[in-house]
């Protein structure tokens, strides 16, 4: 068994995964959304303090598994440095106390493996990662062979939802709030421009769209917000679809996956499903409960790393807020 810890942002989570079967034996997550919502976003120091309170409480529930643990895994990158440290400090203590190896896991690779929680993995895949911190397309051959072929030049897909929600004083996180509001709105009322539409670049950019929405919000009444939300969600998604169309002309998709917290957006999911139909490509999706940050996905990567004896050095293991894959 492997115990895995996730604390890269505002979710405190611990999981226990069986190595031989990939079975998830335990998983608990304590979200900090309520505490951060009053600030309109994550406050790093508050997040770290809440992790320091929540992680030990969850760990107490894992006592029955301690005697059977073969390794401890923890997210080390990317994320908020002050919150990553909380998880790594706990993982190091467990490693020393139980005399078991420690495995440092890349959070982004974890999101890819959210597709395979309690399942066997299979590759190659073309993966779209959409979250609060990242928007990128990757060609994935294994957990060690990942090539990024397109990424955001500024704001991410998920981050833009958070910022638009903040403009409307709708709280945090913005993704679910904007998605719910958009369902009752007119997607074509506001003619926002699709970012980088004329550009040959296969890349993403949300800063310009965000500014256009800000101007619309400032000129609107509250009853207009649902139409703004719907129009924004439509264009934010159309931007991804347009760039994927360009990429698919160069590299036709065979098996395509969407991962990350913002992959829970049902409009994005259905739009990509329609895009893939002419290609006859398979679409892989994480279960909705595993789209956001969780320790089960970290444990699933760690199982693969354990089998390859890819352990971290306890004395030199450090956090890295920024990571590129």
From Swiss-Prot:
Note on cofactor: Binds 1 Fe(2+) ion per subunit.
Task: Return one GO MF term.
Answer: iron ion binding
Cofactors (names): Fe(2+)
The chemistry this enzyme catalyses reads: L-threonylcarbamoyladenylate + adenosine(37) in tRNA = N(6)-L-threonylcarbamoyladenosine(37) in tRNA + AMP + H(+)
Q: What GO biological process, any one, is recorded here?
A: tRNA threonylcarbamoyladenosine modification
E.C. number(s) listed in UniProt: 2.3.1.234
> Where does this protein hold Fe cation?
107, 111, 293
Where is this chain's protein located in or outside the cell?
Cytoplasm
Q: Name one GO cellular component term.
A: cytoplasm
**Which residues take part in binding substrate?**
129-133, 162, 175, 265
SUPFAM superfamilies for this protein? Actin-like ATPase domain
State the UniProt keywords alphabetically: Acyltransferase, Cytoplasm, Iron, Metal-binding, Transferase, tRNA processing
What family is this protein classified in? Belongs to the KAE1 / TsaD family.
- Summarize the protein's role: Required for the formation of a threonylcarbamoyl group on adenosine at position 37 (t(6)A37) in tRNAs that read codons beginning with adenine. Is involved in the transfer of the threonylcarbamoyl moiety of threonylcarbamoyl-AMP (TC-AMP) to the N6 group of A37, together with TsaE and TsaB. TsaD likely plays a direct catalytic role in this reaction.
- The protein depicted here goes by the name tRNA N6-adenosine threonylcarbamoyltransferase
**Taxonomic source organism:** Sulfurimonas denitrificans (strain ATCC 33889 / DSM 1251)
């Amino acid at each position: 068994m492997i115990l895995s810890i996730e604390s890269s942002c505002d979710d405190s989570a611990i999981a226990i995964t069986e190595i031989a079967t990939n079975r998830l034996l335990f998983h608990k997550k304590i979200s900090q959304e309520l505490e951060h919502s009053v600030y309109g976003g994550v406050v790093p120091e508050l997040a770290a303090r809440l992790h320091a309170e929540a992680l030990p409480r969850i760990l107490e529930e894992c006592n029955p598994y301690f005697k059977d643990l073969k390794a401890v895994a923890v997210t080390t990158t990317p994320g908020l440095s002050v919150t990553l440290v909380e998880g790594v400090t706990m993982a190091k203590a467990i490693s020393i106390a139980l005399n078991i190896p420690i495995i440092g896991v890349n959070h982004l690779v974890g999101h890819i493996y959210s597709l395979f929680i309690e399942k066997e993995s299979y590759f190659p895949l073309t993966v779209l990662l959409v979250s609060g911190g990242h928007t990128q397309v990757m060609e994935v051959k294994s957990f060690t062979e990942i090539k990024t072929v397109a990424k955001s030049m500024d704001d991410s897909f998920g981050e833009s939802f958070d910022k638009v929600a903040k403009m409307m004083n709708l709280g945090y996180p913005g993704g679910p709030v904007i998605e719910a509001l958009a369902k009752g709105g007119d997607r074509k009322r506001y003619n926002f421009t699709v970012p980088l539409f004329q550009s040959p670049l296969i890349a993403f950019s949300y800063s310009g769209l965000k500014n256009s929405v800000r101007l619309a919000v400032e000129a609107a009444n509250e009853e207009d917000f649902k139409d703004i939300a719907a129009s924004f969600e439509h264009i934010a998604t159309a931007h991804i679809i347009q760039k994927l169309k360009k990429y698919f002309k160069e590299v036709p998709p065979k098996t395509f996956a969407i991962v990350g917290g913002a992959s829970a957006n049902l409009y994005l999911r259905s739009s990509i499903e329609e895009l893939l139909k002419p290609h006859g490509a398979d679409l892989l999706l994480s279960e909705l409960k595993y789209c956001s940050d969780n320790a089960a996905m970290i444990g699933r990567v760690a199982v693969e790393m354990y089998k390859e004896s890819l352990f971290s050095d306890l004395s030199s293991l450090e956090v890295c807020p920024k990571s590129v894959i």
